[in-house]
């Protein structure tokens, strides 16, 4: 599928669905206190199928949804926006230069993207309890890693195997 309004609508619907699932289930699912960040996972995986501009928009949109759901007043709203936008932009830059779309690539992209986004967030909005924060970030990265493959296959089925700007067909 080429870059079209339908592609943008599909990506927006995927982010909206991820936001609904994040709001409904993320707080009730826990692994040693760590919780998944489905919006970040979805935006990172969708960025694998997008160029730089679309990936940055995906990161910003996912961060805006996430911050609207989870950020209390005066608690890093802007830092969430900036950190997610930068990381998704970086993944979008890699799309053309470094890899072909693959579920084997999605796992490290999501894990390292989660770590990068959370470290940037921490740099912009430092918090007390560094060890507790680091533990939660690592657990979130593990959760997001578990969600990477299903998210990848779902987005790939929705968008097709091709990347942004390429016609349908083989890569």
Predicted regions span which residues?
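Terminal, non-globular segments
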Residues: 1-171
């Amino acid at each position: 599928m080429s870059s079209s309004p339908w592609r943008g609508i599909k990506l927006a619907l995927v982010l909206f669905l991820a936001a609904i699932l994040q709001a409904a289930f993320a707080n009730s699912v826990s692994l040693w206190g760590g919780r998944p960040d489905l919006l970040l996972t979805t935006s990172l995986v969708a960025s694998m199928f997008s160029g730089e501009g679309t990936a940055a928009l995906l990161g910003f949109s996912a961060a805006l949804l996430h911050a609207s759901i989870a950020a209390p007043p005066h608690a890093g709203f802007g830092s969430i926006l900036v950190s997610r936008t930068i990381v998704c932009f970086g993944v979008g830059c890699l799309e053309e230069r470094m890899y072909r779309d693959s579920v084997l690539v999605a796992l490290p992209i999501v894990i390292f993207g989660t770590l990068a986004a959370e470290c940037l967030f921490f740099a912009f909005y430092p918090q007390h309890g560094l060890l507790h924060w680091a533990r939660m970030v690592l657990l979130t990265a593990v959760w997001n890693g578990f969600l990477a493959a299903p998210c990848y296959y779902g987005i790939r089925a929705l968008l097709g195997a091709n990347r942004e700007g390429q016609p349908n067909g083989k890569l």
